[in-house]
Amino acid sequence: MAVAVDQQIQTPSVQDLQIVKLEEDSHWEQEISLQGNYPGPETSCQSFWHFRYQEASRPREALLQLQKLCCQWLRPEKCTKEQILELLVLEQFPTVLLQEIQIWVRQQHPESGEEAVALVEDLQKEPGRQRLEPRARPSGRTPPAQLRSPWPMTAAGPASRARASETGSTASCAGRWRTCCAAAAAPSAARSASARTGRSTSSCARAARAPSATEGALTRTPAPRRPLQRRRPGTGPWRPGRQRGAGTAPPGTQPRQRPSPRPTPRRPRPRLARPRAGQKPWLLVIRSMERVMYVMLIIQMETEDV
């Protein structure tokens, strides 16, 4: 009894689902029948891919029109899921081929993917024909123009022809505008390039004429030293520690001698090394630093002694 009750409870739900499915199918069949004769899957496919929003007055109407065209193309009431997938793959397969093979395959109107592959293989095996291989495309998003079907519209209405003429005129105007802009920008680009070239040439010439100061200082040869001339005793001005009138005192007399002041020790001055011909400048820098450090060490020792 319990099993029978469960069957009675489940039976109406299954029937309801079947009724809903039949109502949906009949709804689509009524919409398709309102359009008149069935245009065929190929024409429906072209209409679906080339549909534009301008052909509908409202967004909802455009959506309903796309649904009608898709149902006319894929026929979900008669085809299974596998057949619908086969149609979608067959529509996309020619777009990955070369342009020559793509046109030829579409002219043959294959009904399945296997038939399309067989046509391409037979075309490549023909004697005397250059082997056509699909080109490798860069990874990434496919351009929007390749997502649409390249099937040409055979029966184009006046609205489609008007849109095509408007598109062509817009493209020609855009091309003329780009040409004019390029012609106007060419003289200014040439003038700027010549100005940059002139500035760079003048700067290079100045750099070639005037050598650097560092290079001149390093390659300069030292001037020859003059020999020291010693003064005669008793001549010249009087200096501390020197006898006044030395050499001129009368004989038999001794000049008065003054105590000489305590000599102050002279601090050695650092002698900076001068560059010689063929000597590296960094060696001169190192030697100069050594002498400066030596003088600083002597000064520090004297201050500690004091």
Curated annotation (Swiss-Prot):
Gene3D superfamilies reported in the protein's UniProt record: DNA breaking-rejoining enzymes
Cellular component annotations (GO), alphabetically ordered: nucleus
Record field: compositional bias (Basic and acidic residues): 123-136
Primary location: nucleus
GO biological process assignments: regulation of transcription by RNA polymerase II
GO molecular function: DNA-binding transcription factor activity
Record's compositionally biased regions (Basic residues): 264-274
Protein name per UniProt: Putative SCAN domain-containing protein SCAND2P
PROSITE patterns to which the protein is assigned, alphabetical: SCAN_BOX (PS50804)
S-S bonds: none
InterPro entries reported in the protein's UniProt record: SCAN-C2H2_zinc_finger (IPR050916), SCAN_dom (IPR003309), SCAN_sf (IPR038269)
Low complexity bias (residue ranges): 188-222, 234-257
